[in-house]
Design a protein with these regions (language model features):
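Membrane-embedded alpha-helical segments that form the functional core of polytopic membrane enzymes
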Residues: 34-55, 142-157
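Hydrophobic transmembrane alpha-helical segments that form the core helix bundle
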Residues: 105-198
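Solenoid-like repeat scaffolds
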Residues: 211-221
C-alpha cells in the first residue's frame, strides 16, 4: 500500500510539472515569457485551482442532493457551510482543501454513484466549458483556458484513478469499492451516518450501528465496517 501511495505522489508531481511546462511553452510561443506574465500566470493558476475546487465539491453536493443525501458540511478552502437542524452556519478556518460531507437516507439499495462521482463530472464540465474562453481571442483568456483545462484534466485523473492517500480512499477508489457488494454499501452508508453524528458531537447509541457482517477476506471490503468499529470503540 505504501508503494501505491508513493507511486501516486509521483504521478501527482508529474501532473503539476506538466501543467507548469504547458504554461511555460504557451508563454514562450506567445513571446510573453516575462516576469510580469509569469506572475499573472501564477495568479490565474491559483484562480483555476480555486474554481476547480469549488466545482468539485459542488459536484459532490449536487450528486448527494440528487441521491437524497442530507448535507452535513460543505467546505471550500477556509469557508465551511454547515447544515444543522435545517439551518446553515458559515465558519472560517484556514485550509487549502475542500470537503463535502453528506449522510444518505435509510434506503436499499444505497445510492452512491452520483454522490461519489459528482466531483469528477463537475471538473470535466468546467474543463469543457473553458473552451468558451477561446471565443474572446485574447492572450489572457487563452492562458486561462490552458490552465483551466490542464488543471481540470489533472483533477479528473487524480480523483478517478483509484488510490489511497494516508489510508483515505479517493473518489475512484470509493466507487470501485462500493461496486463490489451490497454489504460494503451498507457499511459505507452506516459509516456516513455515524460520522455525521460525530461531526455534530451528538449523542450516539452504539446499538444503532451494530449489525451482523460476514467477514470478507478482502481487507478493503471491510474498510468502512472497521472504521465504524473503531469509532464505537473510541466512545466507550
Amino acid at each position: 500500500m505504501r508503494m501505491e501511495e508513493s507511486k501516486m505522489r509521483i504521478l501527482k508531481s508529474i501532473f503539476i510539472l506538466l501543467n507548469v511546462a504547458t504554461i511555460m511553452i504557451f508563454l514562450y510561443s506567445e513571446n510573453r515569457l516575462t516576469w510580469f506574465c509569469g506572475a499573472n500566470a501564477v495568479l490565474l493558476y491559483l484562480l483555476s485551482c480555486a474554481i476547480h475546487l469549488i466545482a468539485h465539491e459542488s459536484g459532490h453536493f449536487l450528486g448527494g442532493v440528487i441521491s437524497g443525501y442530507k448535507l452535513v458540511c460543505l467546505r471550500f478552502g477556509p469557508i465551511s457551510i454547515i447544515c444543522k437542524n435545517n439551518r446553515f452556519i458559515l465558519k472560517w478556518k484556514f485550509s487549502l482543501t475542500g470537503q463535502c460531507i453528506m449522510t444518505p437516507q435509510h434506503i436499499n439499495p444505497v445510492r452512491f454513484k452520483a454522490y461519489n462521482s459528482g466531483g469528477i463530472w463537475a471538473n470535466a464540465l468546467i474543463a469543457i466549458f473553458s473552451f468558451t474562453l477561446l471565443l474572446f481571442n485574447s492572450f489572457w483568456t487563452s492562458l486561462l483556458f490552458i490552465e483551466m483545462v490542464s488543471i481540470g484534466i489533472s483533477k479528473i485523473l487524480v480523483n478517478a484513478i483509484p488510490h489511497k492517500t494516508n489510508g483515505i480512499p479517493n473518489d475512484g477508489y470509493t466507487l470501485k469499492l462500493l461496486k463490489t457488494s451490497i454489504a460494503v454499501q451498507k457499511d459505507y452508508a452506516t459509516y456516513l451516518r455515524l460520522y455525521g453524528k460525530l461531526f455534530f458531537n451528538e449523542e450516539i447509541s452504539a446499538k444503532d450501528y451494530i449489525y451482523k457482517r460476514e467477514v470478507s477476506q478482502n481487507k478493503d471490503e471491510m474498510l468502512y465496517y472497521n472504521e465504524i468499529q473503531d469509532i464505537l470503540s473510541s466512545l466507550e
